Amino acid sequence: MKKISLEELKAYEAPGHYGMTAMRVHGKDETGAQKFWVGLSTFLPGGGAEYAYEDDPLEKVYYVLEGEMTVRDKQGKEY
């Protein structure tokens, strides 16, 4: 087990994302995790990400700490 503090996180450019800051909390490079990774993203109003669920075999989980988030599927349906 490895403890990571917020001050240790480093921002990175997330492909297909805009108006946001992405930081990886746990993953291969950060803590040695091999089968998953955990990120922390902060989106500005109007920020977002392109639809990329078919190109990525990883499942995604979003937990909104503050504000709200709209997800649109490939057909444009909002959730």
Model regions and ranges:
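Glycine-centered flexibility sites
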Residues: G19, G39, G46, G67-M69
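A short, N-terminal "cap"/entry segment at the start of jelly-roll beta-barrel domains
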Residues: M1-W37
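Conserved short histidine dyad/triad with adjacent acidic residue
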Residues: R24-K28, G39-D56
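Conserved hydrophobic/aromatic beta-strand scaffold that supports enzyme active sites
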Residues: K3, A22, V38-T42, V61, ...
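Generic detector of leucine side chains in alpha-helical contexts
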Residues: L6-L9, L40, L44, L58, ...
